[in-house]
């Protein structure tokens, strides 16, 4: 059975692109993450991938990372499935610029 994953591409600690993919196995997910990271790192050496997996309670949780720097801050280690409906805003939500209610966060 396919599982749903969100692959977040980080460059210098900020989310710059997000992909929503389905994978049959954990191995396939890890291969996708490695391939995506290799492609991005060809252009940006400071890139890493963080993978979120859809859980049974309809939330996405961090489940895997590739070349993810420990000094990078993760604003969202989990988020509800409803957040993905605003897929274009997902990078801003993961960067902590916007909350799930589309409200801009001033820091």
Regions found by a protein language model. Name each.
Residues 18-19, 46:
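Eukaryotic scaffold repeat domains enriched in small/polar residues
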Residues 14, 21, 32-35, 61:
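Secreted/extracellular small peptides and ectodomain modules produced from precursors
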Residues 20-27, 84:
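Conserved aromatic
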Residues 1-17:
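Short aromatic-glycine-(Arg/Gly/Cys) micro-motifs in beta-strand/loop hairpins
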Residues 38-107:
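Short, mixed-charge low-complexity intrinsically disordered segments
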Residues 24-45:
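A short, charged, amphipathic alpha-helix used as a generic interaction element across diverse proteins
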């Amino acid at each position: 059975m396919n599982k749903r994953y969100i692959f977040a591409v980080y460059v210098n600690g900020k989310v710059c692109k997000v992909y929503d993919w389905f994978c049959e196995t954990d191995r396939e997910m890890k291969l996708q993450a490695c391939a995506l990271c290799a492609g991005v790192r060809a252009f940006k050496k400071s890139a890493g991938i963080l993978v979120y997996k859809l859980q049974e309670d309809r939330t996405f949780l961090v489940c895997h990372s590739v070349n993810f720097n420990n000094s990078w801050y993760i604003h969202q280690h989990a988020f509800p499935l409803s957040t993905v409906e605003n897929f274009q805003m997902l990078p801003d939500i993961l960067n902590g610029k916007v909350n799930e209610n589309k409200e801009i966060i001033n820091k």
